[in-house]
Amino acid sequence: MAKAKFQRTKPHVNIGTLGHVDHGKTTLTAAISKVLADKYPSATNVQRDFASIDSAPEERQRGITINISHVEYETPKRHYAHVDAPGHADYIKNMITGAAQMDGAILVVAATDGPMAQTREHVLLAKQVGVPYLLVALNKSDMVDDEEILELVELEVRELLSSQDYLGDDAPVVRVSGLKALEGDEKWVQSVLDLMEAVDNNIPDPVRDKDKPFLMPVEDVFTITGRGTVVTGRAERGTLAVNSEVEIVGIRPTQKTTVTGIEMFHKQLDEAWAGENCGLLLRGTKREDVERGQVVVKPGSVTPHTSFEGTAYILSKDEGGRNNPIYTNYRPQFYFRTTDVTGVISLTEGTEMVMPGDTTDMTVELIQPIAMEEGLGFAIREGGRTVGAGKVTKIIN
């Protein structure tokens, strides 16, 4: 059966939920899905229940969201792709890959707890990876009777946003209850509609980098029997028409291929646009020829590099970072777009060490080439946790 064509009738916006573990991100995501499906039934607005969003098998055993779930829904104004970003500190790596895909995010804070350590870490990371707008869902508000406590929590959250240069004074803070909305309680169903109205009105229509040369980081690779190899990811910029020639850059020697098909949410597209999550079918490319961390680009537009100058913020101990300073010859992982690559740091002349909580300039030599350009962001990671975040300021080689 031929797949349905994807119709572009409304602005498309990528959003997500951030926040501390157990503050109710996934429950709220399920509530948004249900409330919109009930209020504005359409082919897009199909209710996704909690279990299907919280879907990877190891998640349920630990009661922690590990993978990133993509949920699709629409309001009368817009079409949304929503990523439920993981909340547990161990899985900040996924948070980085998820947050990099957001035009704005809903920071979920339980009214019963207020902002916690991971709430702060997510706001810090959101700023580092370039999430431009945050608004707040004060979840579990049904469980707090005291108006003063709600106002106090709201004040705390606003201060947290302002501390990372988000518009803390102006950001909408909407009191919601994901659980009560799922149960159909009218007051709290309305709160979710109010939240989505705030998202519609406060996360501007994204300006996509459509005019730049096409680039899509590879997140996943799989084989469709009889058709070939598909790479999936979010187009970072540019547009790509079916039957275009592309290069696959980074990690291995650059290779050329042709894109013979493009899909988004299981619907066929004639072309992929910046900001869209899509799958690209590659002609004559074997599954083992491509891997996560490479990028698919317009030929000649991006080159692979191993050494660069950058500036980075080293997280303090309170932010979940290192206890000890870093020195020249420190060898952490550098997380670019969708993958970790080991690199050796050289501090600038005259700098003996960098303390947690400081910002520093550095020169880095990676052990594998990465598709790189000035301004590219990275996280510095060690033993599975984020210890710093920065940007490439100059390419050396």
Curated annotation (Swiss-Prot):
Region G2: start-end pairs: 63-67
Compartments reported by the entry: Cytoplasm
Keywords assigned: Cytoplasm, Elongation factor, GTP-binding, Hydrolase, Magnesium, Metal-binding, Nucleotide-binding, Protein biosynthesis
EC number of the protein: 3.6.5.3
G3, as annotated region: 84-87
Keyword Protein biosynthesis included in the entry's annotation: yes
InterPro entries registered for this protein in UniProt: EF-Tu_GTP-bd, EF-Tu_GTPase, EFTu-like_2, EFTU_2, G_TR_CS, P-loop_NTPase, Small_GTP-bd, T_Tr_GTP-bd_dom
Positions contributing to Mg(2+) binding: 26
Every tr-type G domain range: 10-207
CDD domains: EF_Tu (cd01884), EFTU_II (cd03697), EFTU_III (cd03707)
Gene3D superfamilies documented for this protein: P-loop containing nucleotide triphosphate hydrolases (3.40.50.300), Translation factors (2.40.30.10)
Protein biosynthesis in keyword set: yes
Major localization class: cytoplasm
Disulfide bonds: none
MF annotations from Gene Ontology: GTP binding; GTPase activity; translation elongation factor activity
Binding site for GTP: 19-26, 84-88, 139-142
Region entry G5, spans: 177-179
GO CC, alphabetical: cytosol
Family designation: Belongs to the TRAFAC class translation factor GTPase superfamily. Classic translation factor GTPase family. EF-Tu/EF-1A subfamily.
Biological role stated in the UniProt entry: GTP hydrolase that promotes the GTP-dependent binding of aminoacyl-tRNA to the A-site of ribosomes during protein biosynthesis.
Name assigned to this protein: Elongation factor Tu
Gene this chain is encoded by: tuf
